[in-house]
Amino acid sequence: MSLVAIGINHKTATVDLREKVAFSPDKIHDAMRSLACTTSSNEAVIVSTCNRTELYCNNARAEEVIHWLESYHNLSHDELMPCVYHHEGQEAVRHLMRVASGLDSLVLGEPQILGQVKQSFAKAKEAGTVAVTLDRLFQSTFSVAKKVRTETEIGTAAVSVAFAAVSMAKHIFSSLASTKVLLIGAGETIELVARHLKENGVSSMVVANRTVERAQAMCEEFGATAITLSQIPDFLPKADIVISSTASPLPILGKGMVEKALKQRRHQPMLLVDIAVPRDIEAEVGELDDAFLYTVDDLQSIIEQNMASRKEAAEQAEVIAQEQSFLFMDWIRSLESVDSIREYRTASMAIKDELVERALNKLAQGADGEQVILELANKLTNRLIHAPTQALTTASRQGDLNTLGQLRTALGLDKH
């Protein structure tokens, strides 16, 4: 038994199965306690996100962890098993380090997974299912993820349209904190854009949408103002940045509307990013002197370049994860050696205590002191050399010269 990682993810399982295997936040504490108690594992951490569910256990067998997962979610072996992957020992360590570093994510290098792994670890500590080994493993993993972020460029290049749009704005404006932003649309992409903008210090955001109720729901999260599409002409002159992504079949911003807004701005530059297909902003807007229009095609070329950059950085990150997983296993082995030494010393002390007690009893009964000491020395010697003698005999009979040599070295027989 050793460290075990069991899981399914976006590469091995459908959304339907991932939903069945996921653990809800309100039940995950009990699930981790059940996993630790039901299996031979004495430590357990469950990482459950929309793209993956993974179980990390110490001192467990892969088969029993898989069986527990099937039983917990009432899934058949045939349904789950084709989608499950499992790693043990050093490979389990390396896998966790790769996951936390974003090397196993749907979007290579995405940073959100590290936060999710940290949350899972915190919940496991709350549940009382983390001890020395998994605590050290996850702390080491967080250090590896930080090392990957600081020593490679895996997280610096935008690889989503939303992130690329905000990255472009950051390149054009020295600081986004003082800019006013108009977002057109209230779908998933615009919501992601708003999140990236908020993370970059933008405090003045207006969200325009066909249904203002949808925009208001999003605005509550980001402290933005919701308006209808018909109100855009009133708010456009105040916007330094316009990012649009709707499902409209016709353009929402025309050249005339933008030209009028620029005049009201006294020709202060305006960045417009159109990430809709079909376009939300007329192509002719790009002809205006103070309007800087970028489309989804412009962003896509940036994303492709950045993906190549991330893949190169990922190769460096893989080396870091591999090296650090080896170092962790060195620590595991040192821990095992400490345990072995402690057990060996305890066993030897028990033999000594037993024989000394017998010797003292004999002395108390008037036995000859010299004879008692000699008997104690002989018995102690015989008891202590019994196991090494058996090991030497077995290695010699089997012709195992390697083990024989190691035993001779360990017993100090080859000093001269």
Curated annotation (Swiss-Prot):
SUPFAM superfamilies membership: Glutamyl tRNA-reductase catalytic, N-terminal domain, Glutamyl tRNA-reductase dimerization domain, NAD(P)-binding Rossmann-fold domains
Positions that bind substrate: T49, C50, N51, R52, S105, E110, P111, Q112, Q116
Metabolic or biological pathway, per its Swiss-Prot or TrEMBL entry: Porphyrin-containing compound metabolism; protoporphyrin-IX biosynthesis; 5-aminolevulinate from L-glutamyl-tRNA(Glu): step 1/2
Reactions catalysed: (S)-4-amino-5-oxopentanoate + tRNA(Glu) + NADP(+) = L-glutamyl-tRNA(Glu) + NADPH + H(+)
GO molecular function ontology, one term from the record: NADP binding
Residues where NADP(+) binds: G185, A186, G187, E188, T189, I190
Important for activity (site feature) positions: H95
EC numbers for this chain: 1.2.1.70
Active site: residue positions: C50 (nucleophile)
GO terms for biological process, alphabetical: protoporphyrinogen IX biosynthetic process from glutamate
Family annotation (Pfam families): GlutR_dimer, GlutR_N, Shikimate_DH
Keyword annotations of the record: NADP, Oxidoreductase, Porphyrin biosynthesis
Function recorded in the entry: Catalyzes the NADPH-dependent reduction of glutamyl-tRNA(Glu) to glutamate 1-semialdehyde (GSA).
Assembly and binders: Homodimer.
Domain notes: Possesses an unusual extended V-shaped dimeric structure with each monomer consisting of three distinct domains arranged along a curved 'spinal' alpha-helix. The N-terminal catalytic domain specifically recognizes the glutamate moiety of the substrate. The second domain is the NADPH-binding domain, and the third C-terminal domain is responsible for dimerization.
Assigned protein family: Belongs to the glutamyl-tRNA reductase family.
PANTHER family in alphabetical order: GLUTAMYL-TRNA REDUCTASE
Remaining remarks: During catalysis, the active site Cys acts as a nucleophile attacking the alpha-carbonyl group of tRNA-bound glutamate with the formation of a thioester intermediate between enzyme and glutamate, and the concomitant release of tRNA(Glu). The thioester intermediate is finally reduced by direct hydride transfer from NADPH, to form the product GSA.
Protein name: Glutamyl-tRNA reductase
Species, as recorded: Shewanella amazonensis (strain ATCC BAA-1098 / SB2B)
Lineage: Bacteria, Pseudomonadati, Pseudomonadota, Gammaproteobacteria, Alteromonadales
Gene: hemA
